[in-house]
């Protein structure tokens, strides 16, 4: 059993589901980050997830070893959902089942269990992953004011 502490990666990207809904994503783009994934992490809140990009595309299989909360896995190839593994159960000891399509994928989004369905994600849907632009505190305050007041003259 892996006793690595859980990793918490910075929110670096977002997935546009349908305007204006975005899922904030931690990006696991290094082999060690991908190996640890969401191990030992509590359940993800709504609109949060982890993005695992892979180059080149290839058949990807994920398992849930030491993942303590069930997840949805959204497999992506060239900006399109190619498979969804919903409500994947936890696995605390080997052997663990692996999940994924037999087709090439260039990324996987892990979401809290039931989140893919709640968001209405389906096979064939477009997936847009974009970096989060860092904003100054003033820009954040102005954005909140605009969202509350509807005023575009800030």
Where are these regions (language model features)?
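Compact, glycine-rich, soluble single-domain proteins
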Residues: 1-154
């Amino acid at each position: 059993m892996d006793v690595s502490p859980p990793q918490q990666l910075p929110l670096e990207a977002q997935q546009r589901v349908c305007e204006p809904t975005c899922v904030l994503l931690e990006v696991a783009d290094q082999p060690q980050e991908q190996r640890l994934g969401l191990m030992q992490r509590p359940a993800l809140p709504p609109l949060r997830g982890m993005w695992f990009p892979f180059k080149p595309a290839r058949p990807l299989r994920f398992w849930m070893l030491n993942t303590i909360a069930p997840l949805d896995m959204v497999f992506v190839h060239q900006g399109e959902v190619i498979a969804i593994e919903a409500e994947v159960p936890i696995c605390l000891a080997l052997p663990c089942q692996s999940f994924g399509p037999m087709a090439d994928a260039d990324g996987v989004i892990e979401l809290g269990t039931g989140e893919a369905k709640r968001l209405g994600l389906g096979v064939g849907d477009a997936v847009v992953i974009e970096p989060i632009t860092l904003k100054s505190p003033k820009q954040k305050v102005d954005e909140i004011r605009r969202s509350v007041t509807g005023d575009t003259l800030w």
